[in-house]
From Swiss-Prot:
The keyword Hydrolase applies. This is 2-hydroxy-6-oxo-6-phenylhexa-2,4-dienoate hydrolase. The record marks 112 as: Transition state stabilizer. Keywords: Aromatic hydrocarbons catabolism, Hydrolase. The gene is bphD. Substrate binds at residues 42-43, 51, 111, 180, 190, 266. Pathway: Xenobiotic degradation; biphenyl degradation; 2-hydroxy-2,4-pentadienoate and benzoate from biphenyl: step 4/4. The active site is at residue 265. InterPro entries: AB_hydrolase_1, AB_hydrolase_fold, AB_hydrolase_sf, Epox_hydrolase-like, HOPD_hydrolase_BphD.
Length: 286
C-alpha cells in the first residue's frame, strides 16, 4: 500500500450552504467503506491533516473511508467571518461536503472545536449521522470545577491576537501532558501554518467578537442527540474541563466516557495507538 501523505490525499470541493456560498473546502481522503469524517480543533494553524495524521492510516486499514476536513477559515479552506456560533456554521460545512461527495451518512470524530461541530451536526442533521466520537469537545458552557476560560483557551486567544513562536510554544506545552512530545519539528510545522494564513487569524477574532464562546453552549439540547456516542477525555486537559464529559454522558441518551491518564487536550495524537483501538472497536460494534 502506498504511504499516505498530506500531498497524495489532498482534495478540494465546492459547497453552498447558508453563509458559505460557493465556498471552497479542503480535505484529505483515503480508504473505502463507511465514511468517517474527522474534525479538527480551533487553535491557530490547525487543520485536518495535522490533527489526525496519526489516525488516518489505522482507520483506513480497518476498512473505512476517512476524510480529514479543514473547517471554514482554517488551513487550505476559504476564509470566512462568522456571524453565528462557529460550531453551527462548521456543521453546515460538514453537511455541504457530504452533499458534494455524495455521502448520505457518516460517522463523525471531533476534537475540541471539532467536537462542538459534531454536537451541532448531531442536533441539526440527525438523519445524516452514524456514530459520534468526541475528544475534549467544546460547546458545553460553564464548568462546575474549573474557572473558565481555562489556561489553554487564554493562550489560544493570545496566539490569535499576537502571533509569536514563543506563545505557540507555551500553548503547545499546555496542550500536551508529555513534554517530550514537543519537538522543534512539531512547533515549526504549526508556526508555518500560522504564518501561511494571516487572514484566518484576523477573521477568527472578528468572528469570536460577533459570536463569543458563551454562545456555543448546546448543553440544553443534548437530549435531542440519538447517535451512539463515545466521549473521550485527557485527564490532564487544560483547555476544556473534564467535568464536561459528565455533562455529555448524562445528557446524551446512549453515551459512554473513557478517560486517558497522563494525557492532555489532544488525545487522538498523544495517545494515538490506544485511541485508534478504542475508536475503531466502538465503530465496529452494532
Amino acid at each position: 500500500m502506498t504511504e499516505l501523505t498530506e500531498g497524495n490525499t489532498s482534495k478540494f470541493a465546492k459547497i453552498s450552504e447558508k453563509d458559505l456560498s460557493d465556498f471552497l473546502i479542503h480535505y484529505n481522503e483515503a480508504g473505502e467503506g463507511e465514511a468517517v469524517i474527522m474534525l479538527h480543533g480551533g487553535g491557530p494553524g490547525a487543520g485536518g491533516w495535522s490533527n489526525y495524521y496519526r489516525n488516518i492510516g489505522p482507520f483506513v486499514d480497518a476498512g473505512y473511508r476517512v476524510i480529514l476536513k479543514d473547517s471554514p477559515g482554517f488551513n487550505k479552506s476559504d476564509v470566512v467571518v462568522m456571524d453565528e456560533q462557529r460550531g453551527l456554521v462548521n456543521a453546515r460545512a460538514v453537511k455541504g461536503l457530504m452533499d458534494a461527495l455524495g455521502i448520505e451518512r457518516a460517522h463523525l470524530v471531533g476534537n475540541s472545536m471539532g467536537g462542538a461541530t459534531a454536537l451541532n451536526f448531531a442536533i441539526e442533521y440527525p438523519e445524516r449521522l452514524g456514530k459520534m466520537i468526541l475528544m475534549g469537545p467544546g460547546g458545553l458552557g460553564a464548568s462546575h470545577f474549573a474557572p473558565m476560560p481555562m489556561e489553554g483557551i487564554k493562550l489560544l486567544f493570545k496566539l490569535y491576537a499576537e502571533p509569536s513562536y514563543e506563545t505557540l510554544r507555551q500553548m503547545i506545552q499546555v496542550f500536551l501532558y508529555d513534554q517530550t512530545n514537543i519537538t522543534e519539528e512539531l512547533l515549526q510545522g504549526r508556526w508555518e501554518a500560522i504564518q501561511r494564513n494571516p487572514e484566518h487569524l484576523k477573521n477568527f477574532l472578528v468572528s469570536a467578537q460577533r459570536a463569543p464562546l458563551s454562545s456555543w453552549d448546546v448543553s440544553p439540547r443534548l437530549g435531542e442527540i440519538k447517535a451512539k456516542t463515545l466521549v473521550t477525555w485527557g485527564r490532564d486537559d487544560r483547555f476544556v474541563p473534564l467535568d464536561h464529559g459528565l455533562k455529555l454522558v448524562w445528557g446524551i441518551g446512549d453515551a459512554r466516557l473513557h478517560v486517558f491518564s497522563q494525557c492532555g487536550h489532544w488525545a487522538q495524537w498523544e495517545k494515538a495507538d490506544e485511541f485508534n483501538r478504542l475508536a475503531i472497536d466502538f465503530l465496529r460494534q452494532r
